[in-house]
């Protein structure tokens, strides 16, 4: 059985100070993740505010992370757009910088049909020849990769995984029927459903909350793999996730990454920070979670 990673991959935030990338904060954050058992780092995805990053900024962030990680865990670059040729060029550059894999979101706004999805993803995979994680997030794109399409794409030698942010277990089961899970990984894109996702055979999660609790979130996966019932272990994490759901990702998680010292609490427009009262409640929820660990 060979997968890109198993367990927790972290959808990395982008730290800003005065609207500029804070490279030192980025390095501090990545070191924290590596020291706390993150199994992969996903760069320039939704949580990174990729729509408001310039090409130069994306490349600088990716290069910084790749150099720091130094092959200890896979670094996966978000390079997908709704333009196939632009996605190819971004993916080729990510490969040149040393990325271990790329993550490709479904085309949004202009969208396409299922045949178009196959051609889009295969064209990028053929051009780049680097492992590809498909990213299905219909809540953001209004477009889904149907299970039949996943089946077709899973036959491609470089298309090796799906980030499944549908939060739909019927979808998961339909996909599972059609793929070889020994060679094609299924990663949840929803932190709050990981208990059942793991129970149903998922290989891991591409996580937001793991930006601040990577060790605890990986321990949950490890416990499940050991045959333990993880419902009770998940409960305090679930409480923190409920607090995190106060607004759209990555607005709340950056209230916590900044609390831990990974840059200021800044986002780029059109995203705005939480109201002060919500920020306080969320940070108190994090403190309560950490205090519970020490009891």
Swiss-Prot record:
Pathway: Amino-acid biosynthesis; L-lysine biosynthesis via DAP pathway; (S)-tetrahydrodipicolinate from L-aspartate: step 3/4. GO terms for cellular component: cytosol. The record marks 46, 109 as: Part of a proton relay during catalysis. The keyword Lipid biosynthesis does not apply. InterPro entries: Aldolase_TIM, DapA, DapA-like, Schiff_base-form_aldolases_AS. GO terms for molecular function: 4-hydroxy-tetrahydrodipicolinate synthase activity. Belongs to the DapA family. This is 4-hydroxy-tetrahydrodipicolinate synthase. The lineage of its organism: Bacteria, Bacillati, Bacillota, Bacilli, Bacillales.
């Amino acid at each position: 059985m060979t997968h890109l990673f198993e367990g927790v991959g972290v959808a990395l935030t982008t730290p800003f100070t005065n609207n500029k990338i804070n490279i030192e904060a980025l390095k501090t954050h990545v070191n924290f993740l590596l020291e706390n058992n993150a199994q992969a780092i996903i760069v320039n995805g939704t949580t990174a505010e990729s729509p408001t990053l310039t090409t130069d900024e994306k490349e600088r962030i990716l290069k910084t992370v790749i150099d720091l990680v130094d092959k200890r865990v896979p670094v996966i670059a978000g390079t997908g757009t709704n333009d196939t040729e632009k996605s190819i060029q971004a993916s080729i550059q990510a490969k040149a910088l040393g990325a271990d894999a790329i993550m490709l979101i479904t085309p949004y706004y202009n969208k396409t049909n299922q045949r178009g999805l196959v051609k889009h993803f295969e064209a990028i995979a053929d051009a780049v020849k680097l492992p590809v994680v498909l990213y299905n997030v219909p809540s953001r794109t209004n477009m889904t990769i149907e299970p039949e399409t996943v089946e077709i794409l899973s036959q491609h030698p470089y298309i090796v995984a799906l980030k499944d942010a549908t939060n739909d277990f019927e979808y998961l089961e339909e996909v599972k029927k059609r793929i070889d899970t020994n060679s094609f990984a299924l990663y949840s894109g929803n932190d709050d459903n990981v208990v059942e996702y793991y129970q149903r055979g998922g290989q891991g999660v591409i996580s937001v909350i793991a930006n601040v609790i990577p060790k605890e979130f990986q321990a949950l996966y490890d416990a499940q793999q050991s045959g333990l019932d993880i419902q009770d272990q998940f409960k305090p994490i679930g409480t923190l996730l409920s607090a995190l759901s106060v607004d759209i990702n990555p607005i709340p998680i950056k209230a916590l990454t900044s609390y831990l010292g990974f840059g200021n609490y800044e986002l780029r427009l059109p995203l705005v920070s939480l109201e002060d009262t919500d920020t306080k409640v969320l940070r108190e929820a994090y403190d309560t979670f950490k205090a519970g660990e020490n009891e």
